[in-house]
């Protein structure tokens, strides 16, 4: 075990995860809770040969951009990491992260877009909570402590949608209705535009006679309507327990309804998602009306708005359930120009097997996970698409993938940052490539 000790240093930068960076005799220390421009005393928590880690104890010089965190759980909850930094400075930090990622690889852009931002509080329409029954039978519900498996009991969350935040107060008591032999693994709260969903991942199914109290109690939780969904184990499928149709929906730009189930991917920040879709549509060439391919399409978040402009849209996703959801969303929105296919986008030749993709493309859109799209970038680069729009949640993999496009003769026309997750170090970016 490392002997804990106190050190002092000046903070000169922010690391990608929001920790302050200081140096002592040339050795870097990453200090949780510290900001550039500050002189801090910190407790060393990790000591390696090339670097150290620590947690701030006190300040002798304070940054002009430091603010009082709004949440009483900040620094213990593993959710937010930047509530102590002024929000506009958070956006500046994220913009710098994206630009530095590109500049390190000598990749330049012709134009910088104005950062897309919105409400800094109450923006999350989805949360995954840990839950555990204590020895006294009461439930502990909250988020994991930063760097730990311990659950931090949460009674408020300022970044959650107000209706979800209100549930945090009553949720532990409501869970007491569950049979005592059931182990609860995770609780997902989702705010759709028509209802709230409480989705529970548990160790076994509920029996019919155990459902009565659950169903009746949902009505007592008030408005908006609350649905209860249930699945057994991580590999199970969510099924609705209460009376009603199996549907949740979100409104997306273009007067479209996007239906989904708990467990399926949605953008958690509805306001920024709307602005992101609008940004994407503005970046598309006004003369484009032919064929667009949407890779990592999910359940159609980008495909369906694109279908309003293009003669043909082809969406590709790795999960059958999402592809089925996208196809159903197209039907329900009376869109006949969109087709959806399942393909493993971590396999290099997967797209060659989809014969329905024409040889002449106007647009390719990618919105991959953090790991990026390295396995299909050769296909994208050789597709001949006039435009490529890449939406990324990890700037480093975005730059790596962008090199394939640059080598094929594309240039970055526009680059911008989306503040999808205020008060966290999470960075979202959008880039337009053209030939």
Regions found by a protein language model. Name each.
Residues 57-69, 75-184:
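Extended interfacial segments that mediate partner engagement and assembly in macromolecular machines
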Residues 113-120, 186-189, 233-237, 417-420:
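Short, solvent-exposed loop/turn elements at beta->coil junctions and helix N-caps
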Residues 41-43, 128, 293:
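Hydrophobic beta-strand signal
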Residues 189-205:
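Carbohydrate-binding surface patches
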Residues 1-73, 340:
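Terminal RNA-binding accessory module
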Residues 2-8, 13-16, 205-435:
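Rossmann-like S-adenosyl-L-methionine
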Residues 20-25, 142-145, 326:
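Short, acidic/hydrophobic/Gly-rich beta-strand patch recurrent on exposed beta strands
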């Amino acid at each position: 075990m490392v002997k804990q000790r106190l050190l002092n240093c000046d903070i000169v930068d922010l690391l990608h995860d929001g920790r302050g960076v200081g140096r002592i005799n040339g050795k870097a220390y990453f200090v949780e809770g510290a900001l550039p421009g500050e002189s801090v005393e910190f407790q060393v928590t990790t000591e390696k040969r090339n670097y150290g880690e620590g947690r701030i104890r006190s300040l002798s010089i304070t940054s002009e951009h430091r603010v009082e965190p709004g949440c009483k759980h900040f620094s213990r909850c593993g959710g937010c990491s930047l509530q102590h930094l002024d929000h506009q400075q958070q956006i500046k930090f994220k913009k710098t992260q994206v630009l530095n990622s590109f500049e390190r690889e000598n990749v330049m852009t012709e134009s910088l877009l104005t950062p897309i931002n919105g409400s800094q509080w109450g923006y999350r329409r989805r949360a995954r909570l840990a839950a555990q029954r204590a020895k006294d039978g009461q439930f502990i519900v909250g988020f994991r402590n930063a760097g730990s498996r311990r659950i931090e009991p949460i009674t408020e969350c300022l970044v959650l949608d107000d209706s979800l935040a209100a549930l945090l107060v009553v949720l532990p008591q409501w869970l007491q209705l569950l049979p005592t032999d059931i182990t609860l693994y995770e609780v997902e709260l989702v705010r759709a535009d028509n209802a709230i969903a409480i989705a529970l991942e548990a160790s076994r199914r509920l029996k019919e006679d155990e459902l009565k109290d659950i169903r009746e109690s949902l009505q007592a939780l008030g408005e908006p309507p609350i649905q209860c969904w249930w699945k057994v184990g991580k590999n199970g499928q969510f099924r609705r327990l209460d009376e009603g149709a199996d549907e949740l929906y979100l409104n997306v730009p273009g007067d479209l309804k996007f239906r989904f189930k708990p467990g399926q991917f949605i953008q958690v920040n509805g306001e920024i998602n709307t602005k992101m879709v609008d940004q994407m549509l503005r970046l598309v060439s006004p003369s484009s009306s032919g064929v667009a391919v949407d890779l990592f399409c999910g359940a159609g978040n980008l495909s369906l708005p694109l279908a309003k402009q293009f003669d043909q849209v082809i969406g590709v996703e790795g999960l059958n359930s999402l592809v089925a959801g996208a196809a159903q969303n197209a039907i329900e929105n009376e869109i006949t120009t969109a087709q959806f296919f399942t393909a493993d986008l971590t396999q290099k030749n997967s797209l060659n097997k989809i014969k329905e993709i024409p040889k002449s493309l106007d647009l390719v859109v990618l919105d991959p996970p953090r790991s990026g799209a390295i396995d299909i970038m050769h296909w994208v680069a050789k597709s001949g698409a006039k435009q490529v729009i890449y939406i990324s949640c990890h700037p480093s993999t975005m730059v790596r993938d962008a090199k394939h496009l640059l080598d094929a003769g594309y240039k970055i026309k526009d680059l911008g940052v989306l503040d999808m997750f205020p008060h966290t170090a999470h960075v979202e970016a959008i880039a337009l490539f053209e030939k």
